[in-house]
Swiss-Prot record:
Record protein name field: Urease subunit gamma
Keywords: Cytoplasm, Hydrolase
Subunit structure: Heterotrimer of UreA (gamma), UreB (beta) and UreC (alpha) subunits. Three heterotrimers associate to form the active enzyme.
Gene name, Swiss-Prot/TrEMBL: ureA
Record field: catalytic activity: urea + 2 H2O + H(+) = hydrogencarbonate + 2 NH4(+)
Organism placement in taxonomy: Bacteria, Pseudomonadati, Pseudomonadota, Betaproteobacteria, Burkholderiales
UniProt main location, coarse: cytoplasm
Annotated family: Belongs to the urease gamma subunit family.
Species whose genome carries this gene: Cupriavidus necator (strain ATCC 17699 / DSM 428 / KCTC 22496 / NCIMB 10442 / H16 / Stanier 337)
GO biological process, one term: urea catabolic process
Amino acid sequence: MELTPREKDKLLIFTAALLAERRKARGLKLNYPEAVALITAAIMEGARDGRTVAELMHEGTTVLGREDVMDGVAEMIPEIQVEATFPDGTKLVTVHHPIV
């Protein structure tokens, strides 16, 4: 199977998000890479489902709360930018203060 670098990146994000989801389900607080991966994957999947950029900008702030992450992680992520594939092309989704 031949994958482009972009496809490999998407799979890596999905795998990290899956791991983060499992750890969160076990009651563990997420670290920086896990939190970023989980929020990023949610945005990418929302785009694939046909949601709008505005909807995803809002939904990106509801994926995780401060109680879901280790101390200091929320402050380390002032924004997340995701280049997501929508039905009408690729767009940049920026989520400001994703963990509140």
